[in-house]
């Protein structure tokens, strides 16, 4: 009632196969799979890039702290 039954889905799938053919659907599935794979690799490379930027900014902050500490020590010695 109000929902799509399994039989309706099967009939729609059968009509789609008859209209497009299995070769066309197979190539479409391959294209879709390639797009998903490309999207996943782009997302993972973006995460790696962000992690590298975070570690670089932490190293920069640590370097600046060390410079500040060494300047303070130099002032104390004078």
From Swiss-Prot:
Q: Where are the transmembrane segments?
A: 1-21
Q: What does the record list as GO biological process?
A: protein transport by the Tat complex
- By its UniProt entry, which Gene3D superfamilies does this protein fall under? 1.20.5.3310
Q: Does the keyword Protein transport apply?
A: yes
Outline the segment boundaries, as ranges, of region: Disordered. 40-78
Q: Write down the membrane topology.
A: Single-pass membrane protein
Q: Which Pfam families match?
A: TatA_B_E
Q: What is the annotated localization of this protein?
A: Cell inner membrane
Claim: Lipid biosynthesis is one of the keywords in the record: no
The entry's cellular-component GO terms read: TAT protein transport complex
Which of UniProt's keywords are assigned here? Answer: Cell inner membrane, Cell membrane, Membrane, Protein transport, Translocation, Transmembrane, Transmembrane helix, Transport
- Bias category Basic and acidic residues: which stretches? 46-78
What InterPro entries does this protein map onto? TatA/B/E, TatA/E
Q: Which range is the signal sequence, renumbered to this chain? A: none
Q: Which domain of life is it from?
A: Bacteria
Q: Which GO terms describe its molecular function?
A: protein transmembrane transporter activity
Q: In which family does this protein belong, per the annotation?
A: Belongs to the TatA/E family.
Oligomeric state and interaction partners are given as: The Tat system comprises two distinct complexes: a TatABC complex, containing multiple copies of TatA, TatB and TatC subunits, and a separate TatA complex, containing only TatA subunits. Substrates initially bind to the TatABC complex, which probably triggers association of the separate TatA complex to form the active translocon.
**Functional summary from the UniProt entry:** Part of the twin-arginine translocation (Tat) system that transports large folded proteins containing a characteristic twin-arginine motif in their signal peptide across membranes. TatA could form the protein-conducting channel of the Tat system.
From the Swiss-Prot or TrEMBL record, give the protein name: Sec-independent protein translocase protein TatA
Origin species, per record, is: Shewanella sediminis (strain HAW-EB3)
